[in-house]
Amino acid sequence: MEIFSTASFDKDFRKATKEEVKRINAIVEGLKASNFIGKPLRHAKNTYSVRIGNKRFVYNIDGSRILLIFFKSREGVYDYLG
């Protein structure tokens, strides 16, 4: 699978703690190896959220492409998604 990231995700990822980075990397490796991880988001097709501490890691799967969308606080994610 190919992995892409948004500018927003890159910015959020740079601000993440070492532990958060380890967990995100583990999730991404799991996505490459198998199937979906996390909770599907209702109003966004093929988009999933994984809780990491008090933040949410949001990604989209489209065929063989994984798009890392963002890693924000719960409020920030759901405000953004509407």
Feature annotation, model-predicted:
Residues 1-27:
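Arg/Lys-rich, positively charged N-terminal/basic patches that mediate binding to nucleic acids
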Residues 2-4, 15, 52-56, 60-82:
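Enriched for short, Lys/Arg-rich terminal
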Residues 8, 46, 73:
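Residues that form or immediately flank small-molecule/cofactor binding pockets and catalytic motifs
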Residues 10, 47-49, 58:
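Short aromatic/hydrophobic contact patches that present stacked aromatics
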Residues 23, 42-43, 65:
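Hydrophobic alpha-helical segments and their boundary regions
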Residues 28-51, 78:
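A short, surface-exposed loop/turn module that caps and links secondary-structure elements
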